[in-house]
Amino acid sequence: LCVPANPNVTSGWNAIDAIMMLTEGRDGRFESGDALPDYVRSGNEPKQITVHCRSGRPMLAKPTAKVEPITDVFWEPYREALRACEPNHGMLKFHKDIWCVICEAAAASLSQSGTDTTSRDVEEWFRGWSRYKMDEAAARRAMLQSYDVATGVRPIDIPFALGDAWRRLYPLIVELVSFGGLAAGQYKAFQQVAMEMERIAFGPPAESVAKLLRLMRDGVVQLSDQTDAPEGAVVVNAVIASPSQADETGPLSQLILRGDVEVDPLTQAIRVSDSGNVLGGRKGLAVFGRATEGWVVGNDTLSRTLHSQIQNWAGTIAVEMHG
C-alpha cells in the first residue's frame, strides 16, 4: 500500500489484511504476551488506522485446534434435511426451508457440548446480533469473546455454534440457493442472513483477531461508524465491490449493454448454466466468479470443491473438440 508513515488512515471493515500490511508489514512486531500478543511499533506504521463500518459489527474468530471438532456424523441428519428440499428448487423459502435447519443444527451442537439450547434461542440471538449497531466497546467485547471461545479458553457459545453449523452445511446451502433456487421474493432474506454469517462463520483466524485486538487496545486501530473520513486522512477502500459494480468501461459492462449476457433481476448477477455458459445471451461465452454472485452463491470461497462450473465447462470443451 502506498501510504506514508504516520498519517491517519481510514479503511473499510473487511480491512484486516490492509491493517496487517500497514503494521506488521512495515516491520512492526507482535511478541508473546499474556492474554494477547504485545505489539512493538516500528515507527513506519500510520499514526492511527480508523476502520469504518456502518453496523459496527465485527468479524468473529475462526476456531483453532484447541476446540475439539464435532464428528462429521453429527451433521448428517441436517444435511439430509437440506437434501430433502432439493425437489422444491425454485420454490424454496429461505427461513422456512433452510435457515431453520441451520439453527436446529447449531442448537443441537451446543446441547451436545453441555449447554441446553433450542433453535429459538439461536434465532433470538441472531436477531439481536443483526438488528442493532455496535459501538467500539461492544465490538471489542464480541471479538474478545470469540477469540476466547476459538482458543478453548471459554466454552462454545451460540455465535460459535451457529458459525460452525453454517460452515459445515454451506455446500448444501450453495446448491439449494444457486441457479434460482429460492422462490420469488426470498433472495433478500437469504442475502441479509448470508451477509451477517460472513462475519460469524468466515471471519479471520483467531491469531489475526488477537493481533487486531492488541492494535485496538494500543490505539493504533479504532472503529468508527462515521462514513466521512477526517480531513487529511489517507483513505483505503478495503471493501470488495458487489457483483453489480462492474467498471462502466470494462468488458463486462459492454457485454451487458449489447445483450450478450443476461442479468438476473433479483440478484443483479450474470445468469449462467452449471457449466458457466451465459443464459439468454451469446453462445460460446462463459462467465465465472464474482460477476455471477447471487445467481451462483459463494464465489469468494477459498474452497476448490464448492463449485463445479469450471470443471463442467472444461468437460463441454473437451467433448466439442474430440466429439
Functional labels for PLM-detected ranges:
Residues 1-321:
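Flavin (primarily FAD) cofactor-binding/catalytic cores of flavoenzymes
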